Amino acid sequence: MRDTDRPGGGGLPRRTLLLTGLAGAVAAGISLPSAAPASAATRTAGTNGWPFTSTGISTLPVPGTPASVALLEGDVSTVLLHVVRRFHYEVEEVARHELAGHRPAAGLTGHTTNYASGTAVEIRPAAYPLGATGVLFPPQLAVVRDILKECGGVVAWGGHLRRPHAAHFQIAVRPGDPRLRGLAQRIKGWTQAPGQGAGVLTLGA
């Protein structure tokens, strides 16, 4: 692959996606698929423990972008919208129809079952399809790692799966985990304070 190749156009060149394998997946809080993963037809909750629902789901605009996405309202949407905003500003711009969120559970397996609870989002899924490698340039990957670090284990990334899914971000804690509320409150504070939050340039950083 040439250095001049671009992932989905308009972004930094493609490079080999650096994966951390099994250890990275465990650290990120994503359950790796078993030999015979249960389908959504035999379960009532996603792999992250959140129940399937069509209640409390809203299609929400992502501030600073032309895009919107269907997510579970409340702390979940606050956190995932923040992730999308940082991705848009720091990794790759997100166009109007380049997000996918809540969807019916039928046919979903493994980590994708979390879409049915509104607790996961795909960012530019056509550019970063399931199983694809070489879709992020190292500086972009560094930003993704920084986003995960900022979220303190509350958010997991599909790039750490054995079969990578770089478009996928999900809530990685169970319902009621206080870390989710704490992170959501911090994000709300950042968005209300001048000079903080996604998209803010920090000089000298």
Name each region found by the language model.
Residues 44-89:
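Active-site acidic/histidine clusters and adjacent loop/turn architecture
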Residues 90-99, 154-161:
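Surface-exposed patches in mature extracellular/periplasmic domains of secreted proteins
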Residues 1-12:
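N-terminal secretory signal peptides
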Residues 91, 104-132:
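Mid-length scaffold segments of soluble, non-membrane domains
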